Amino acid sequence: MSYQDILVFLDDGTTNATRVNTGFKLAKQHDASLTGIALATMKPRKVKTDSSMVRRRMSQEMAEKLVAEFTSQAADKGVNSKTIIIAGDADESTLKLTHYSHNYDLLILRQPNPDHENYSRLTQLSETVLLKSGRPILFMPYIGTDKCPGERVMITWDGTASACRAVHNAIPILQHAKEVVLVIVENDKT
């Protein structure tokens, strides 16, 4: 069992390069296609403006820059790639990202850095995709990114069919893990 389609989240955070390189490595390892996805709804870091029109334009430009860099790197590394830019408000873009995630074998997301200007937005986005995608997610930490991803794996389990599918779909990562931690989420369904 291997992955055919991998989705990696692109942003202007300090861990973007590590996350993208992990995506390239996994795509090569599994002979998979790698899709880079950027949100044109994120306020670029260090931008100070109250104008929503300026913020939207700068967000779109940032997303275009991220996908251009990703496309160039993918070509240099010989990785089959695609890109997606999601526009819309915060809730709409989160919903779109969740829907896109259903089409991929593995998602590579980031743990939000509390020092990032978009921390609350990234937290909401990550939590929603994590809980609603039903897909295995390689959740890259904002610290310790020099460690080999996939050695320590956490499975969140709530007893649902989507949790079962996600665990089954994560078998290619689980086979190589040195440690697997199971977190059971109890609710009225379990």
Residue ranges and their predicted role:
Residues 44, 91-93, 116, 147:
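Generic structural signal for helix capping and beta-alpha/helix-loop junctions
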Residues 36, 83-85, 139, 182:
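A structural preference for short, hydrophobic beta-strand core positions in alpha/beta folds
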Residues 88-91, 115-116, 187-190:
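Short, small-residue-enriched loops and turns at beta-alpha junctions
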Residues 33, 48-87:
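N-terminal positively charged helical leader segments and presequences
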Residues 1-53, 132, 149-190:
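Small/aliphatic-rich secondary-structure junction motif
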Residues 16, 63, 87-90, 119, ...:
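A conditional alpha-helix N-cap/helix-loop micro-motif detector
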Residues 1, 72-107:
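Structural beta-alpha unit
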Residues 16, 20-28, 96-145:
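Gly/Ser-rich helix-loop-strand patches that form or flank binding pockets
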